Each structure stands twice: as C-alpha cells, then as structure tokens.
Swiss-Prot record:
GO terms for molecular function: magnesium ion binding; xylose isomerase activity. The keyword Zinc does not apply. This is Xylose isomerase. Its cofactor is Mn(2+). The keyword Phosphoprotein does not apply. It is found in: Cytoplasm. One of its GO terms (biological process) is D-xylose metabolic process. InterPro entries: Xyl_isomerase-like_sf, Xyl_isomerase-like_TIM-brl, Xylose_isom_bac, Xylose_isomerase.
Length: 441
C-alpha cells in the first residue's frame, strides 16, 4: 500500500520555485567541477529517525503521525520497509542507513532476533533489486537494551561482550549481503560514569580486542566495506572513550587499528565536544581519516544532541570545503542523522526536512567549489605562512635547524613584526561568495 500517496516525486525546480515539495538548489544532474551533485553529495536517509522515530521525549509520549504505525511487531517492520522504499524513490535519494533494531524487533532470544532480521533483510534485498537506493552503512545497536547498561565491548560483564560480538557478527553478514559501502561503530555506552568502579585500561584493551575481532571476521567473510568510528563526547555516557576525532585517532594508533578505520563525523557531536563541524572534518582530513558524515546540526543554546536537519549555510559550506579538499568522501556519504521537530509530526514534514537539508548542502557544495577554484583562502594562507618557505623557516620545515641555530637566528633579530590575521576580511569574502551563489538564477 502507498504511504505517501499525496506526495509526488521530488524534482528540481530551481531557486525561483515556490513549490515547497521541490528542490531549489539540489539538481542531482548538475555538474560542479568534474562530478554531478549526486556524485559529490551521496545523500542518505537515516532509517531510525525517519521510519522508527515517534517523537517521544523525556517529557511526552510519541506523537508522530505515521501510516505504518497501525501495525505492530513484524508486520510493522515489514510496513516500514515498504514505506522506506517509497520514500527513497520519491526523494530520489541514493543511500540509506540503519541499526539492526531499526529494521526488525529483538526477539526473546538471540536466535529469534536473528530470525526476525533474516526475514526483513530478505525483504530489503528484494526491494533493492529494483531500487537505485543502496546501503551506505549499517550497524549494531549496542546501547538501547538494558544488557548494555555498563557498555558493550567495554562492559565489566564478559557475557555482554560476547553478546555484543554476536550482534556485530550478524551485522557484518548483513552488510556483506546487502552490499553496504561501510560499517559503523558508535560507542554510546563505551565509557564510564566514575573512575571509582572502573578499570579503564582493561576496558580500552577490550574495546581494541573487539575491533580487531571485527576486522578479522570481515576478512573471513570477504566484506570489503570501510569500517567507520563515529566519535561523540557524551550522551548517553558521561565519559565516552571516542570523545572526538583526535581522541579516537589516538586510540586507533595505540592499538594498531588505524589502517582499518576511518571516521564518520557528525556535526552535532562536534558541537558537544566543543568543536565546530569543520574542525572535526579538518582533523580527520589532514590525517587521511575522513570517511563519511552524519549531516545534521545542533542547537547552540542547548547542551544535548538535538539532531536537527542541517540548514546553516555557513556550516554546510565549510563542511563541503573540507570534503572537496579531501577529494570527496570515497565510499562514504552525507547521511541525514536528523529528525523532524516534535511539532512537525505529519508525514509530509519528512519530505520538507530532507529537501531543506539537501538544498543546504547543494548550496554549500557550490560555494565551496568556487572558493577552492578561486583559491580564496589558499592564497591568503600561503602568504601567511610564507616565512616557512625560505630562510630559517625553511630549515625548520626541512629538519635541518636545531636549538643552537635557532638561538643564533633569534639573537640577531630586532623587534619581531607580525601581520594581521584578517579574520573579518575573510569572513566578508565568505559572505560574498555565499550570497552570490544564492542570488544566482
């Protein structure tokens, strides 16, 4: 049965369009540089927020109007698959993502859970045969069920570690079967509340053991997708071990895992870590670790993960700047890990939200491409650091200087003159490029 029968396929109509159910800036076939927008952006729908989210919060019950919610159990799971692929087709989106519990309910036993997953994966596989929409990534939910109260791979209970491993094993088998481009690890419960009852060294060692086992099993079954770590500093756990890119990178390097992983970076997680979105992208990029993106935004006035759809054009521009500088996302994409607000409870709001996010990143892509083509920031940065291309600066970079040589150089200096960083000028240029792209017809 159709679930969005009042919605037609979303088409590109251009900036002058007044149709709320049309793209104003995202034209999948438009070339930006040597790729189309669709190839650059690789958009993805998050199954959990879009098809399982009900709008509930700590202060109120679920209120989302979803036609498929008239069903329950496995019938509900099947209806969600039907609704999902109708949504994908009407939005003309190339990818989707899910956790295992998003697509099928957990059973009374692990075997029953596997059976439920197999039934729904069979159904998804059939739909994918005739759909352009592919699986960007999947993952195992290792944080919702009470068994994970003390963590999964970092749990103090070895039985929980084993159960988590079984779920990831199944997840990797599903990833291979459905042709997932990536597989994600997010450690929402991998951390601690107090050191008074925590063996941090054992927990970190066990987390590394767990990830090495995952790498080994992927090789065993021939899954060649990219493994991704998704950093987040807090929520639900006070001290999460994958606080930010730098922290997680240090962990991967320490335990010999760096060659097997890249990062899935979420904008709102960067906010919670006290960073900008572009900061996290830059840190990952310069270390060759930028793999994929969870595209959303947070509310700067609130201290939790609000998962709003991305509409901040400065943020999308600076994000796309980093992604283009990275040469793209490879097998990754821009997954809308975002939910409509609780007050936006009608089915068509799902389309309005995704259109807003897709248009926002399309603008960001075009502005970022122009900034890079015109070398707006590159030229300024090169001039700013010019002292390292000649004289004593060049010797520092080439490793031929030492403290003796640097002291001798410093002793002959007079008063050192610095130059302005010109932040305001550069922000004005960013505004100019952004406004020019938005004004173009």
């Amino acid at each position: 049965m159709p679930y969005f029968d009042n919605i037609s396929t979303i088409a590109y109509e251009g900036p002058a369009s007044k149709n709320p159910l049309a793209f104003k800036f995202y034209n999948p076939e438009e070339k930006v540089g040597d790729k189309t927008m669709e190839e650059h952006l690789r958009f993805s729908v998050a199954y959990w927020h879009t098809f399982t989210g009900d709008g509930s919060d700590p202060f109120g019950a679920g209120n989302m109007i979803r036609p498929w919610n008239k069903y329950s159990g496995m019938d509900l799971a099947k209806a969600r698959v039907e609704a999902a692929f109708e949504f994908f087709e009407k939005l003309n989106i190339p990818f989707f993502c899910f956790h295992d519990v998003d697509i099928a309910p957990e059973g009374e036993t692990l075997k029953e859970t596997y059976k439920n997953l197999d039934i729904i994966v069979d159904m998804i596989e059939e739909y994918m045969k005739t759909s352009k929409t592919k699986l960007l990534w999947n993952t195992a939910n290792l944080f919702t069920h009470p068994r994970f109260v003390h963590g999964a791979a970092t749990s103090c209970n070895a039985d929980v570690f084993a159960y988590a491993a079984a779920k990831v094993k199944k997840g990797l088998e599903i990833a291979k079967r459905l042709g997932a481009e990536n597989y994600v690890f997010w450690g929402g419960r991998e951390g601690y509340e107090t050191l008074l009852n925590t063996d941090m060294k054992l927990e970190l060692d066990n987390l590394a053991r767990f990830l090495h086992m995952a790498v080994d099993y992927a090789k065993e079954i021939g899954f060649d997708g990219q493994f991704l770590i998704e950093p987040k500093p807090k929520e639900p756990t006070k001290h999460q071990y994958d606080f930010d890119v730098a922290t997680a990178l240090a962990f991967l390097q320490t335990y010999g895992l760096k060659d097997y992983f890249k990062f899935n970076i979420e904008a709102n997680h960067a906010t919670l870590a006290g960073h900008t979105f572009e900061h996290e992208l830059r840190v990952a990029r310069i270390h060759g670790m930028l793999g994929s993106v969870d595209a959303n935004q947070g509310d700067m006035l609130l201290g939790w993960d609000t998962d709003e759809f991305p509409t901040d054009l400065y943020s999308t521009t600076l994000a796309m700047y980093e992604i283009l500088k990275n040469g793209g996302l490879g097998r990754g994409g821009l997954n809308f890990d975002a939910k409509v607000r609780r007050g936006s409870f009608e089915p068509e709001d799902l389309f309005y939200a995704h259109i807003a996010g897709m248009d926002s990143f399309a603008v960001g892509l075009k502005v970022a491409h122009r900034l890079i083509e015109d070398r707006v920031f590159d030229e300024f940065i090169e001039e700013r650091y010019k002292s390292y291309t000649e004289g004593i600066g060049r010797e520092i970079v080439e490793g031929t200087a030492d403290f003796h040589k640097l002291e001798a150089h410093a002793l002959q200096l007079g008063e050192i003159q610095n130059q302005s960083g010109r932040q305001e000028r550069l922000k004005t240029l960013l505004n100019q490029y952004l406004l020019e792209v938005c004004a173009a017809r």
